[in-house]
């Protein structure tokens, strides 16, 4: 009976598993979407007064041109794999064996850390996606370069795809964090109830024992 009382409520387990599944799915989606943001051809129209006479010069842009995006793909992929392990331990191992008790806290820290760090780095890179053109001007991929006096086209799809991937990574981090918080609160609540119940039963047992001796 004492072991049964220590089990976390079913709704806690259900919410935790749902959060982990959602986090894993979002992490996979973020990695896939970011990794397919490639071979985007951006056309930069140089100013007519420049040496290039207003000619549109093509530049192929891919996510691998930006290290933070590469980091996000790797981190999201690893996080999804680790979450799959966590789901296996919770669903099939029931969290009972020693290996599960050791791994679950580590996974609970590692997965959000990976996702949050990768998302933060990607957000910083998204705010300044640009490259240096042949005439030495810094060209923004998502918007025209006012300083150069020219314009950029062809980067809309790339920018949209990158932005969505970053937000998916953030959503995955939040989902995993919520699952961990719910699991932690549920476990502490069930543990506290078990201690109080055992304490009260112990006290009542002592009282009954004393009364029995009086007779």
From Swiss-Prot:
Residues 195-205 have a biased composition (Low complexity). One of its GO terms (cellular component) is plasma membrane. InterPro entries: CASP_dom, CASPL. It is a multi-pass membrane protein. It holds the Pfam family CASP_dom. Residues 1-13, 90-105, 183-215 are cytoplasmic. The chain crosses the membrane at residues 14-34, 69-89, 106-126, 162-182. Keywords: Cell membrane, Membrane, Transmembrane, Transmembrane helix. Coiled coil: none annotated. Residues 35-68, 127-161 are extracellular. It is found in: Cell membrane. Residues 187-215 are annotated as: Disordered. Belongs to the Casparian strip membrane proteins (CASP) family. Homodimer and heterodimers. This is CASP-like protein 1U3.
